[in-house]
Amino acid sequence: MNLLETRRSLLEEMEIIENAIAERIQRNPELYYHYIQESSKVFPDTKLPRSSLIAENKIYKFKKVKRKRKQIILQQHEINIFLRDYQEKQQTFNKINRPEETQEDDKDLPNFERKLQQLEKELKNEDENFELDINSKKDKYALFSSSSDPSRRTNILSDRARDLDLNEIFTRDEQYGEYMELEQFHSLWLNVIKRGDCSLLQFLDILELFLDDEKYLLTPPMDRKNDRYMAFLLKLSKYVETFFFKSYALLDAAAVENLIKSDFEHSYCRGSLRSEAKGIYCPFCSRWFKTSSVFESHLVGKIHKKNESKRRNFVYSEYKLHRYLKYLNDEFSRTRSFVERKLAFTANERMAEMDILTQKYEAPAYDSTEKEGAEQVDGEQRDGQLQEEHLSGKSFDMPLGPDGLPMPYWLYKLHGLDREYRCEICSNKVYNGRRTFERHFNEERHIYHLRCLGIEPSSVFKGITKIKEAQELWKNMQGQSQLTSIAAVPPKPNPSQLKVPTELELEEEDEEGNVMSKKVYDELKKQGLV
């Protein structure tokens, strides 16, 4: 096959994969939100969309049909397969070199046209096969293409991911990443400590130490050099890491592993745990060193190198357990709550709960009664019509609540937001609700428009929305202020009419603070009473 045709075919397949991924995210935006929320935890520098765009997308997601968790995780694993195919084709594309004659004749337009005509002749008789090839590629990644009967949509997976089975990836108790199956490790932990007095909740308390950056090192449940403890942590760390990647299939596993390994090599091993009182902690030797110089000399010593070579795998697994458990903090909290509920169940309640989990686990990821495409749009249109009836011809334009979703109509009406108030001064802007309307008189917009009318804003103008009324009030205020200023000017006093204060009008104060006239004060002073 011609190299140009090979490159074109690869680009075509990559574009088909891109469209297939976009189609799934458009159908169910939760696929993207489930990924981006965890990605921002793992990679804090992730550039998130603008807050306004997130709010708009939340409304968009709100209008979509709510899908089951099993379906969300299943499609994420399917998209992960698509991404692997995409990367393979991209690598193949990059390895294919362009023909030498094309490189030499890049700027020769006649030669390029001649080669193009030659290609057209070669492909003229292959149009039908070409169309069939494109359709087969599209069907390979299309939704529901794995269904045995094309007329009945029974399996949401594509033909490419036909063999994908989530029940082979998750156990029943894990519920597709909702809970962690830690009871098996509780049994192993009892064998490690050689005691039977540690309950499952106490074991979960021990695991909570790994959510803290220091406690699992400084206050470990056992001696960190104990062989049984080391073997146990290796198994637990492996499980938590596997659980993380199968719960968040869209995260780049290589990038996450490289990030954790880089932090371990360049920060953790170099004494990331520091204390002003104790100094620097060495995780391999479990010792504190007072100063940086002492710690640096310790790193090149024989004892440290021996401990590092002997315990490196354990310390790295311990660190990975700490990091992945922090990423899975929500799942760990849900697991703990679920364990507490199970312990409070009676035998019958426990059996009923297990039956519910089994039904969810065995139920298909896709239900044939789910709305798709035009059916979903029709449902949205019906909802819109109901809202139009409620809002007297308005579209579905509810303000957002604290959760970022549109406010329910009953709450919208309860706050009086269905009532409109128009302000002519603010260019006929309409305010919904009395509270918003009252507040706008103190806002910059209203004050600015008053000043544009030549009016100095004050509380007197609160409640006035008509331009004419505001101007008339301002003129009246100006006239009254002029009259008041004239009346406030006092006449010049006549020096001959100035009144001289008498002795009775003058006041004195004794040592105790009593105030009296000067005449009375003088009399009392003569008598020695003050």
UniProtKB/Swiss-Prot annotation:
Segments forming Matrin-type zinc fingers: 280-310, 421-452
Signal peptide start-end: none
Region (Disordered): 367-388, 488-516
Localisation: Nucleus
Single GO term (MF): RNA binding
PROSITE patterns recorded: ZF_MATRIN
GO biological process: mRNA 5'-splice site recognition; mRNA splicing, via spliceosome; U2-type prespliceosome assembly
Domain of life: Eukaryota
Keywords: Metal-binding, mRNA processing, mRNA splicing, Nucleus, Repeat, Spliceosome, Zinc, Zinc-finger
SMART domains in UniProt: ZnF_C2H2, ZnF_U1
Ranges of Basic and acidic residues composition bias in the record: 368-388
Compositional bias of kind Acidic residues: 504-513
Coiled-coil residue windows: none
One annotated Gene Ontology cellular component of this protein: nucleus
Function comment: mRNA splicing factors, PRP9, PRP11, and PRP21, are necessary for binding of the U2 snRNP to the pre-mRNA in an early step of spliceosome assembly.
Protein family membership: Belongs to the SF3A3 family.
Other observations noted: Present with 3920 molecules/cell in log phase SD medium.
Name of the protein this chain belongs to: Pre-mRNA-splicing factor PRP9
Source species of the chain: Saccharomyces cerevisiae (strain ATCC 204508 / S288c)
Gene that produces this protein: PRP9
